[in-house]
Structure formats: structure tokens, C-alpha cells
Regions:
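Active-site environment of divalent metal-dependent phosphoester hydrolases
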Residues: 10, 33-35, 58-64, 91-94, ...
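Conserved beta-strand hairpin/beta-sheet module of binuclear metal-dependent hydrolase folds
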Residues: 1-48
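A short acidic (Asp/Glu
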Residues: 15-16, 63-67, 95-98
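Short regulatory "switch" loops immediately downstream of catalytic or recognition motifs
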Residues: 17-20, 69-72, 152-153
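Flexible, acidic/histidine-containing loops and adjacent segments that form or flank the divalent-metal
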Residues: 1, 73-184
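A generic short-segment signal for beta-strand/edge and adjacent turn/coil regions
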Residues: 21-24, 50-58, 105-117
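Active-site metal-binding motif and surrounding structural segment of the metallo-beta-lactamase
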Residues: 24-25, 34-86
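A signal for specific C-terminal beta-sheet/loop modules enriched in small/flexible residues
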Residues: 25-34, 56, 159-169
Length: 184
């Protein structure tokens, strides 16, 4: 297992690569802040096929590199990303009254996701991934979702408040053979 924390200034961006019995996997978590977005997006570009891209939450220091990566591929039609996990994306809408950077980034990400899914660049976009689900077991590894709960997502749905948007933050535990990785 190879875990590559990217130099993303004060933000988060992580690449996890490993081999199971049946295939090699690449998982990407978050994309770092605007000042490293191009650097992170270019690294993601060199990975080849990405099996799973996880966005933990919508803060700018987690989302900018992913926005840049998706923007670079807005016209691509070949599948490059197997699954994208983003909670609450269907709840984001653009509102001139609430024109904060976080809302704008989240709205732009949602537009990108819809476009890339429609054009085949992303195979599957999963929303509503919660700790209430069974572990995800594939080949010889397992992913446990530790948060958020369904209750937190329902509260987000009702409030549409920027503070609640960040409570969709996903905590994941990944288990593989003798490795255990806890990711925010």
C-alpha cells in the first residue's frame, strides 16, 4: 500500500494506491486549496484511471484541486473515474443572496459532476454515503464509513446552512490485510 500525502499547503489531498488479489486500485481523497489546485490536478491527471474519488466536505481547502481536475476534463468522454463520493451535492443550488465562496465552489463542483457523469468521464456518482451503511467490501479490502450519519444528512437537507454542509465531512476507515488507514 502506498499513501501519498500531497503538498497542498493548508489543505488536504491524498492518493492511496494498493494491489489486491485481483487488481491495482487508486483512491483519491480531496484536492487541496486554490494555491495548489493546478499542481494537485496535474498529479491526479498522471495517475491514469482513478477507482474512487472521495470529497470529504466542501471547504475550499479540500475542493479546489478537484474542481481544477474536473475543469481540465470537462470535454472528455472516456471513463477516467470509477466512482465519486460526494454527500449533499444534490442540495447545492446557486443563490445570489448567499454568494459565499463555499457555496460557489460547491455549486461549481455539482455542475462539473453532472456534466462529467453525463459525458461518461465519471462512471458512478454516489451521494448519501453514511455510517449507517454496511461496510464496502471489495476483493481483499474493506471500507467502513464512520461519518456522517443519515440524521446529519437529513438535517443538512432541511437547513441548507453552510455550517451543516461541512458536517457532511466523511470519516473513513480502510482495512486491507495488515493495514488500517483512518481518513478525515
Amino acid at each position: 500500500m502506498k499513501i501519498i500525502p500531497l503538498k497542498a499547503a493548508h489543505g488536504d489531498a491524498l492518493i492511496i494506491q494498493f494491489s489486491s488479489r485481483n487488481k491495482d486500485y487508486t483512491i483519491v481523497v480531496d484536492g487541496g486549496p486554490p494555491e495548489t489546485a493546478e499542481y494537485v490536478a496535474n498529479l491526479y491527471d498522471k495517475l491514469g484511471y482513478i477507482d474512487l474519488l472521495i470529497l470529504t466536505h466542501y471547504d475550499n481547502d479540500h475542493i479546489a484541486g478537484i474542481l481544477e481536475f474536473f475543469s481540465q476534463h470537462k470535454h472528455d468522454t472516456s471513463e477516467y473515474v470509477g466512482q465519486v463520493w460526494v454527500n449533499g451535492a444534490q442540495l447545492i443550488y446557486y443563490d445570489d443572496e448567499v454568494n459565499t465562496a463555499a457555496y460557489e465552489d460547491a455549486f461549481n463542483l455539482t455542475v462539473c459532476l453532472k456534466h462529467l457523469k453525463d459525458h461518461g468521464f465519471i462512471c458512478q456518482w454516489r451521494d448519501g454515503i453514511t455510517c449507517d451503511m454496511n461496510p464496502i467490501i471489495k476483493d481483499d479490502f474493506r471500507i467502513d464509513i464512520l461519518s456522517p450519519s443519515t440524521e446529519i444528512l437529513r438535517t443538512l437537507e432541511k437547513s441548507l446552512n453552510i455550517m451543516w454542509m461541512n458536517m457532511v465531512c466523511r470519516m473513513i476507515q480502510m482495512l486491507m490485510k495488515r493495514y488500517r488507514l483512518l481518513m478525515p
